[in-house]
C-alpha cells in the first residue's frame, strides 16, 4: 500500500493545500469533528452524498477517516448518519479508515482524576458529576473526554485495576458496535494495541510528540502487534511542548480546525514559537516513515500549515510538512525496517503504559505476580530502549538510543517465531525460553551487529531499511540538543553535535541522499557528523 499523508478538510482551505503541492495521489482526508465546530461543517452536513467533499473523495478514490469519535476534547456524542458512513465505507473499501478513538484509555483515567481531585460526592451520579465538573472547569460544555456523563454515572468510581480493564473493553466494544467495527485507535500514554486488535481494530495509530515519552516504544509496539495480526499502523503527530508548555498556532488570526480558543477549552497556544520544535516535527515524520508507518495524520495541521486563510503562505510548519511529503515521493521504495529481534511481553499486559513506572500499572497500584511480571518487562524494555546523554529541553520522546532501532515489541500470545530471529523473553515465564529461540536483553547489541548489514557506533539513533538484497537505507538521527521556547523560538546546541562511525559489510558503498551532516570516508569506514536535531539518510 502506498504511503498516505492525511490532510484536514475545511472548504476554504482545502484547495489551497492542493495548490501548495501538499496533496498527492495517495494522500487522504481527515474529517475534523468536535463539539465546537459549526453544524454546517460537521459530518452529516459537510460530507453528505453529492456534496463537494463526497464528490472529491469519489472521483479521486482517496482515503478518508473521521478525526474523531471521542477523546482529547469535550465528549460530544454526535448522532452520525450511519447510512452515510456506510456509503463511504462501501465506496472506499479499505481506504475508509473509520473513526479515530482518541486516547480513550488514558482519557478515562484523567476524567476520573478530575472527579477525585474535585471531591465529587459519592455515588457518582449524573448530577454530582455535572456539578463537580461545572464548578472546577467553567467551560461551555461538561469536561469529560472518555465517555458521556451518563455513561460515567453508570460505571461509577473505578478503584480496581481489573474493573478498569473490564470497563475499557466494554467501552471499546460498544464504540465498535456503534461504528460498525470501524474504530481507528489513537493511543499515547497507554497503548491498548492488544485489546484493540483482539476486538477488531484494523489498524492502530500511536499519537507521537514531545509530551509523550519513548516514541520508539510506541512505534515498536505498534509495528510488532500490527505484524502479529497482519494489520498496519500509522502515526498521529501532535506539536505540544516548549517552555512554557503550549501548542504552536502559526495561523495569525488564531483560528484552528477544532474551532476552540484559549478561553473555551483548557489548553494554551502561543503562536509560531509555541509548542515543540520544527526540528522535532521533521524527525517525527521521518522516523515514522522509515519505521514502517503506512500513514501519518496530525492533530493541529490545518492551523499551522498556512500563515492565514486568505493568501495561504506556507509557514515553517507547512514547509517541513511539504519537504517531508516530497521526501516520501522521491524515496517511495525504501523497503521495511530490519527487526530481527522481538521483545516479548506478558499476555496479561493488554495495554502497555509507562516503562519507567514502578509498582503502578495504568495508574493503579499493583503487587504480587502482576508486579513481578511488570518489573521483568519494564527492566528489559528500559535496557532495550535506553538512551545516552541529553542536551536542551526536548528530550524523552525521540532519543539517541544506545543500540540499533531494530527491535519490535509483541505480546506472547500472538508471538510468531517465524517472523523473528530471536526473542527477548520479558514474559516472566521461564518456560517461554524452552519453546522459542531466545537471547537476553544484554545480548541484543551483539545479535544486531551480526544480523544488520552495517555497524554504527558513536551514540546516535539509527535504523536500517531493506528494500532488496542489493539495496539498503540507513537513517541516523541526532535526537538531542534542541532548545525550544516561546521567548526565543528554537536553536541547536553545538555541544550536542556527534560523529558516528559507519562500517558496511560486503564491501558496500554508502551514498548520502538527504539531511544536514558532514560525511568523510577513510579506510573503508564512514564518519558522519550530525548537528543537534538533524539527521542523515543514505543508501548502500
Regions found by a protein language model. Give the residues of each.
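Mature N-terminal, pre-catalytic/accessory segment of carbohydrate-active enzymes
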Residues: 1-72, 79-100, 116-141, 454-467, ...
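Hydrophobic targeting/anchoring helices
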Residues: 76, 99-100, 109-110, 162-381
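Carbohydrate-binding surface patches
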Residues: 336-373, 415-432, 455-504, 531-536
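The substrate-binding groove and active-site-proximal loops of carbohydrate-active enzymes
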Residues: 4, 8, 30-44, 63-79, ...
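Eukaryote-skewed repeat-based solenoidal scaffolds used as protein-protein interaction platforms
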Residues: 90-94, 102-193
Amino acid at each position: 500500500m502506498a504511503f498516505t499523508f492525511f490532510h484536514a478538510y475545511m472548504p476554504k482551505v482545502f484547495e489551497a493545500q492542493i495548490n501548495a503541492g501538499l496533496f498527492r495521489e495517495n494522500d487522504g482526508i481527515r474529517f475534523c469533528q468536535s463539539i465546537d465546530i459549526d453544524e454546517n461543517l460537521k459530518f452529516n452536513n459537510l460530507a453528505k452524498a453529492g456534496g463537494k467533499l463526497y464528490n472529491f473523495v469519489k472521483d479521486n478514490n482517496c482515503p478518508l477517516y473521521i478525526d474523531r469519535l471521542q477523546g482529547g476534547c469535550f465528549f460530544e456524542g454526535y448522532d452520525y448518519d450511519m447510512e452515510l458512513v456506510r456509503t463511504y465505507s462501501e465506496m472506499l473499501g479499505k481506504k475508509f479508515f473509520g473513526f479515530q478513538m482518541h486516547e480513550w484509555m488514558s482519557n478515562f483515567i484523567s476524567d476520573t482524576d478530575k472527579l477525585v481531585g474535585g471531591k465529587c460526592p459519592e455515588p457518582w451520579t449524573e448530577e454530582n458529576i455535572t456539578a463537580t465538573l461545572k464548578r472546577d472547569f467553567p467551560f461551555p460544555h461538561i469536561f469529560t473526554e472518555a465517555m458521556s456523563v451518563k455513561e460515567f454515572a453508570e460505571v461509577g468510581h473505578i478503584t480496581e485495576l481489573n474493573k478498569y480493564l473490564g470497563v475499557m473493553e466494554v467501552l471499546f466494544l460498544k464504540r465498535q458496535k456503534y461504528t460498525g467495527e470501524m474504530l481507528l485507535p489513537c493511543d499515547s500514554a497507554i497503548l491498548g494495541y492488544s485489546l484493540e486488535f483482539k476486538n477488531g481494530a484494523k489498524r492502530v495509530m500511536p499519537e507521537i510528540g514531545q509530551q509523550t515519552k519513548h516514541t520508539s516504544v510506541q512505534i515498536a509496539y505498534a509495528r510488532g502487534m500490527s505484524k502479529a495480526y497482519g494489520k498496519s499502523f500509522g502515526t498521529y503527530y501532535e506539536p505540544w511542548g516548549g517552555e512554557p508548555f503550549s501548542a504552536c498556532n502559526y495561523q495569525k488570526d488564531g483560528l484552528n480546525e477544532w474551532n476552540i480558543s484559549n478561553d473555551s477549552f483548557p489548553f494554551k497556544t502561543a503562536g509560531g514559537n509555541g509548542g515543540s520544535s520544527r526540528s522535532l516535527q521533521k524527525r517525527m515524520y521521518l522516523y515514522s516513515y522509515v519505521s514502517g508507518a503506512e500513514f501519518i495524520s496530525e492533530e493541529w495541521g490545518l492551523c499551522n500549515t498556512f500563515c492565514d486563510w486568505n493568501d495561504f503562505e506556507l509557514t515553517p510548519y507547512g514547509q517541513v510538512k511539504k519537504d517531508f511529503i516530497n521526501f516520501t515521493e522521491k524515496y517511495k521504495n525504501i523497503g521495511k525496517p530490519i527487526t530481527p529481534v522481538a521483545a516479548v511481553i506478558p499476555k496479561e499486559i493488554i495495554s502497555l503504559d509507562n516503562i519507567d513506572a514502578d509498582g503502578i500499572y495504568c495508574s493503579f497500584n499493583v503487587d504480587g505476580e502482576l508486579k513481578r511480571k511488570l518489573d521483568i518487562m519494564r527492566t528489559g524494555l528500559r535496557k532495550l530502549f535506553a538512551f545516552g546523554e541529553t542536551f536542551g529541553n526536548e528530550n524523552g520522546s525521540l532519543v539517541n538510543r544506545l543500540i540499533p532501532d531494530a527491535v519490535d515489541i509483541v505480546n506472547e500470545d500472538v508471538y510468531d517465531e517465524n517472523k523473528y530471529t530471536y526473542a527477548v523473553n520479558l514474559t516472566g515465564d521461564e518456560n517461554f525460553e524452552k519453546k522459542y529461540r531466545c537471547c537476553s536483553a544484554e545480548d541484543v547489541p551483539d545479535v544486531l551487529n551480526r544480523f544488520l548489514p552495517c555497524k554504527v557506533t558513536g551514540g546516535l539513533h539509527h535504523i536500517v531499511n531493506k528494500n532488496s538484497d542489493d539495496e539498503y537505507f540507513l537513517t541516523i538521527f541526532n535526537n538531542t540538543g534542541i532548545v525550544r521556547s516561546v521567548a526565543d523560538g528554537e536553536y541547536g546546541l553545538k555541544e550536542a553535535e556527534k560523529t558516528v562511525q559507519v562500517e558496511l559489510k560486503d564491501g558496500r558503498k554508502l551514498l548520502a541522499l538527504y539531511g544536514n551532516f558532514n560525511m568523510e570516508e577513510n579506510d573503508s569506514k564512514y564518519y558522519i557528523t550530525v548537528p543537534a536535531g538533524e539527521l542523515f539518510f543514505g543508501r548502500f
